[in-house]
Amino acid sequence: MNSIPEGRPTPNLPRTANKRGVARLAAAQALYQMDVAGTGVMEVVAEYEAFRLGKEVDGTQYLDADPQWFRAIVAGVVEDQLKLDPMIHQALTEDWPLSRLDSTLRAILRAGAWELKARKDVPTAVIVSEYVDIAKAFYTEDEPKLVNAVLDRLALVIRGESRGAKPRHKS
């Protein structure tokens, strides 16, 4: 069952999620839309809140999301992108700059990085796990492992805690 209109990244396997989890997925999709279509933050947030979150689109029901969480992620990523992108770049291997990643993967990493930085009240393991699950919904290859490794490295840098990975390089 496809819950995203044509032309947008679509998850492979829908997963039962809480309202924050749905907000994270919607935020990644909105950030993707902004990146690919050049849509502004106010426009995309208004579109999702009016026509997508908890609504029926093309015969498919979107799950309810926490609209404040959704707004915070999207607006936070936009506001902090010039700080987040270099941090993500540092967490990637030298031969994989952020610009080489596709728009969906960049959106997932930016949202996860922002949440690690801005939402210290949310446990690192929850953030990393949620964004790995989002990556698994869109990818079947190594991308979820990449999301796990990058967010784990960022958690070490941002929060001083990690599940084992160390930053790969410094530039």
UniProtKB/Swiss-Prot annotation:
One matching Pfam family: NusB
Protein family: Belongs to the NusB family.
Gene this protein is translated from: nusB
Protein name in the entry: Transcription antitermination protein NusB
Annotated organism of origin: Brucella suis (strain ATCC 23445 / NCTC 10510)
Its biological purpose: Involved in transcription antitermination. Required for transcription of ribosomal RNA (rRNA) genes. Binds specifically to the boxA antiterminator sequence of the ribosomal RNA (rrn) operons.
GO cellular component: cytosol
Presence of the UniProt keyword Transcription in the record: yes
Lineage: Bacteria, Pseudomonadati, Pseudomonadota, Alphaproteobacteria, Hyphomicrobiales
GO molecular function: RNA binding
GO biological process, one term: DNA-templated transcription termination
Keywords for this protein: RNA-binding, Transcription, Transcription antitermination, Transcription regulation
NCBIfam families, per the entry: nusB
